[in-house]
Amino acid sequence: MVTGHPAGLPPLFLDRSLGRRQVPELLRAAGLQLQTLSEVYGIPADEDVSDVDWLELAGGHGWPVLMKDERIRYRPAERDALLMNEVKGFCLTSGNLRAAEMADQFLAVIDSVADACVEPGPFLYAVSVRGLSRLDLS
């Protein structure tokens, strides 16, 4: 079990796809430092923030992004924002997980996330019960 934020890992940024409360609370309870889209933009403004805007923000701050929308790499505007802003992304591959399962999958790979973040972005990794696997952005 994780007991603290890995050394050298910047604060994490959580996309709205992970929810406003349950997943962030579980990750914080494990000691991770993070910000959510709703904390940065406020409620209800967070509902109207485009993926392009928050990808630019996260990349500009060097915040690794945790998300659930791996299709982001196929949408031209979002893919371009991910690439141009050198985003370091980590995406759950299963869309049918409860909050505790989502948090558990991220916590199980958090040391690998920290290791990956030593490298420059942009990149996108799939997160699954088997660990991390780098996704093609070309």
Question: Model-derived features: where do they sit?
Answer:
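Hydrophobic/aromatic beta-strand patches that form the interior of the parallel beta-sheet core
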Residues: L66, K88-F90, Y125
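Catalytic phosphate/metal-binding cores of nucleic-acid and nucleotide-processing enzymes, i.e., regions
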Residues: Q33, E39-V40, D46, L83-M84, ...
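Short low-complexity, flexible loop/linker segments enriched in glycine and/or proline
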Residues: V49-D53, D80-M84, Q105-L107
